[in-house]
Each structure stands twice: as C-alpha cells, then as structure tokens.
C-alpha cells in the first residue's frame, strides 16, 4: 500500500504528538522530529507504529539549515515522497511583559530562528517534493499560539 507521508517537527509532545497519532490512525507514514526529547519522540513513534504507521524519528533543529535538509532527505530516502509538512516545532522564553530585560537578544534571535526561519527552511527544503504530491499540504502550528511573553 502506498501510504501518504508527513514530516512533523516538534512531534515529541503536545500538538505534534496529537497530530502524529491522528495521522497514524488515518494510515500515514511519519517522520517525527524533536530537538532534544528523543525518548518522548520514540514513545510517540511506538504509539504510531502500534496504529500501523511506519515511522522515522530524527533529532533535528529547524533553526539549522543543514538539519532541515537532512530531515527532508532522510524522509525521501525512506519513502521516496512527501505529502505533508507540519511545522510544529517552537521555542519561547516565558517572561512577563513588564520585564523586557528578562529576554536577551540571544533569546530573541533563537526564538525567531526556530519559530519563523525554521518553518521557512522546512518549506524551502520540502517544496520540490510537495509539488509532486496530489494531496500536498503545509501547516504551521506554533506561530498561531498567543503566549504571554515579551519576544513578540
């Protein structure tokens, strides 16, 4: 069976985990990425495998161009296609609005690289494969959240 394939960044917990399980229930194969919580991502992969999905788990950092390329390349190497990209990886620093000094320039840059540049790079690396899919879709979930922080 030629199952559809999705990459889900930030798939080790929360929205990413929920999307992974939902797609596995619907018969998708999945590349699941995490930046550091490999054990949690592997647990999500096992849940998806138990639902019939094939999975590929990668430690990746969407703020790193090379890691974005490697994620897409590994997905294509495994399944020779890509149908959906779920940009869910996100980063923040919880800081009260009235405390601007609580957020460093380095914090801001890292947040921006992950939450804005990361989805762009994943889309850029995925585009040529997504254009070949009759069901292609791209979603960016993290940027839709409203968080009580000062970085935006």
Language model regions located:
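The beta1-alpha1 cofactor-binding region of Rossmann-like NAD(H)/NADP(H)-dependent oxidoreductases
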Residues: 38, 59-71, 105
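Active-site loop of short-chain dehydrogenase/reductase
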Residues: 3-4, 53-54, 81-82, 130-142
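Conserved NAD(P)H cofactor-binding loop of Rossmann-fold oxidoreductase domains
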Residues: 88-96
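Conserved glycine-rich cofactor-binding loop
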Residues: 12-14
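Conserved glycine-rich Rossmann-like NAD(P)H-binding loop of the short-chain dehydrogenase/reductase
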Residues: 26-43
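Single conserved hydrophobic/aromatic residue that forms the stacking wall/gate
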Residues: 144-152
């Amino acid at each position: 069976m030629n199952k559809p394939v999705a990459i889900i960044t930030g798939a080790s917990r929360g929205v990413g985990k929920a999307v992974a399980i939902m797609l596995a229930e619907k018969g998708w194969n999945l590349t699941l990425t995490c930046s550091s919580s490999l054990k949690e991502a592997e647990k999500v992969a096992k849940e998806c495998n138990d639902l019939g999905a094939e999975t590929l788990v990668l430690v990746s950092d969407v703020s790193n161009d090379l890691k974005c390329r490697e994620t897409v390349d590994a997905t294509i190497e495994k399944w020779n296609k890509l149908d959906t990209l779920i940009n869910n990886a996100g980063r923040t620093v919880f800081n009260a609005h009235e405390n601007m000094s609580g957020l460093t320039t380095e914090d801001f840059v890292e947040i921006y690289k992950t939450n804005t540049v990361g989805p762009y790079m994943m889309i850029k690396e995925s585009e040529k494969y997504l254009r070949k899919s009759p069901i292609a879709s791209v979603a960016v979930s993290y940027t839709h959240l409203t968080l009580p922080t000062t970085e935006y």
